[in-house]
């Protein structure tokens, strides 16, 4: 089996048969099931959410995470090949899967409690639940040091106030991982559920790029969450930065995917 598309540097020789098979599986899914429907969604600025469970069935959500954490337990190389093929279909598709796996499933797997893992990871890995990552705000990019969103401790609860901007999957999400600074200026991660009082989202329309990706603003006004919603095993900037490191691996594949799109 060989790498699909141009292989000027004989990269196929560096890949395992499993990795090549996984790439072909992703390639066939994009070519046969995704490309026929993407044009309409691109024009309308919508995402075909009905494919989420198919992505889960194929193991494309959090692929490199262990199976007990909702992933497929494949190599990081295989995960990269999956994202490469999803990007070939559309940037919105790659972004959807990358956020779900690298920015939502990964931090729950790495920093969450056992209860949080049991509650969220199976559904997220299956594509039955959708997640988003709330870091960027309107006055700064993905720079956690400039964060204005706050988390104030009140007994066994936290009160979250602030907003997040340019959030992929925002209005689609059943759970949002929102990063906020506590009263000591320590960055902490909280799992906010759709429908919580004071928690809302508003989609951003008229984009020139990533049109098939749902991008939203998240608003938190005195949102009360129990302490059990806080990621217990991480605090400080390492939390969001480690998630971004996971996601940037997928972003690097864009530069390969675009020129190979015709293949």
Regions found by a protein language model. Give the residues of each.
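A glycine-rich, basic-preceded beta-loop-alpha segment at the flavin cofactor/substrate interface
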Residues: 2, 76-78, 195-198, 214-248
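Single conserved hydrophobic/aromatic residue that forms the stacking wall/gate
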Residues: 254-263
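A short core secondary-structure module
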Residues: 161-201
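Internal helix-loop-helix
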Residues: 57-128, 168-175
């Amino acid at each position: 089996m060989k790498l699909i598309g141009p292989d000027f540097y004989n990269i196929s020789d560096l890949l395992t048969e499993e990795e090549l098979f996984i790439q072909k599986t992703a390639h066939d899914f994009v070519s046969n099931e995704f490309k026929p429907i993407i044009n309409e969604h691109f024009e309308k600025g919508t995402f075909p959410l009905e494919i989420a469970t198919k992505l889960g069935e194929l193991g494309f959500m959090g692929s490199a995470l262990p199976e007990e954490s909702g992933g497929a337990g494949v190599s990081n190389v295989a995960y990269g090949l999956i994202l490469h093929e999803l990007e070939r279909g559309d940037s919105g598709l790659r972004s959807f899967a990358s956020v779900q796996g690298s920015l939502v499933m990964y931090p729950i797997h790495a920093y969450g409690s056992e209860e949080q893992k049991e509650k969220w990871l199976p559904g997220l890995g299956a594509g039955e639940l959708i997640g988003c990552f709330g870091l960027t705000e309107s006055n700064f990019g993905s720079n956690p040091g400039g964060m204005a969103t706050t988390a104030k401790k009140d007994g066994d609860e936290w009160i979250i106030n602030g907003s997040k901007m340019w959030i992929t999957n925002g209005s689609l999400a059943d759970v949002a991982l929102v990063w906020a600074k506590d009263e000591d200026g320590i960055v902490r991660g909280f799992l906010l559920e759709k429908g919580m009082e004071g928690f809302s989202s508003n989609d951003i329309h008229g984009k020139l790029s990533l049109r098939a990706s749902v991008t939203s603003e998240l608003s938190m006004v005195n949102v009360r969450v129990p302490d059990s919603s806080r990621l217990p095993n991480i605090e400080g900037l390492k939390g969001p930065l480690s998630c971004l490191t996971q996601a940037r691996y997928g972003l690097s594949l864009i530069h390969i995917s675009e020129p190979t799109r015709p293949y």
